[in-house]
Amino acid sequence: MVDLNCDMGEGFGIYSFADDEEIMPFIDAANVACGFHASDPNTMRKTVELAKKYNVKVGSHPAYPDLVGFGRRPMKMKREEIKNLVMYQTGAIKAFLDEFDMPLNHIKPHGSLYGVSAKEEDVANGIADAAEIFNVGIFGMVNTFHEKVYKERGVKFYGEFYSDLEYDETGYLVIAKGRNQYYPTDRAVERCMRAMKENKVQTIQGNDVDVGCETICVHSDTPNAIEILKALREYISPKKNSSEKSTNGNHSKMPYIIAVSYTHLRAHETD
């Protein structure tokens, strides 16, 4: 079974971030912003309702309380504060899920919370503390405290690969200023295929590093995101209960998740 996951609901008030409904038919799971880096109650409810319409599972997308900075700025917080932060936001999205009789599927930290938790054990443990309360898994990066902490504690861990971002020699993501750039579809697909088969990716320095590939992330702010998604679907698997069918029969049984992200935040700061 193949799941496809996307960061969604990241507009607020009269401001929109991306066309959620355009991408929703391609995905199986949505990480919904919970109000701290983006979104508001009306947007959260609308996004959950849209997910139900397209039979999409929903997870929370908690962040540092940084609406102005879109959750991109790290904050110094104790483990208990991180736990409470994630519980508060996840509880908010779960309230809307309860209204639509939908379960909470997972947690995927956003932006700097994702990046800091990859490097700092206490932060990763704070997120795991919250995940245990909700009894759900977490999306993250292999060979970081994401994998170490979550696996040691028995929290389900999904190793994530990014199709449209480069990696450095340490295995962290490289984000340049003005990230909303076209990423060649063929290259994105080629990198994903190698990651799935070998769990490797070539870095910007030219060496290979190990990567996880249970979930593949495509950012919605990549101008050709839909093109990349369609190409990946052809190689990997059609969405369940979708009219989108793969022409590559053998690939349809590959057990991977495609993750489409509406964020471009990272575990490795480059500016």
What are these regions (language model features)?
Residues 68-99:
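Glycine/small-residue-rich loop that forms an oxyanion/phosphate-binding "nest" at active or ligand-binding sites
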Residues 225-237:
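C-terminal helical cap(s) of enzyme catalytic domains, especially alpha/beta-barrels
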Residues 263-270:
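Conserved small/polar residues in nucleotide/adenosyl-binding loops
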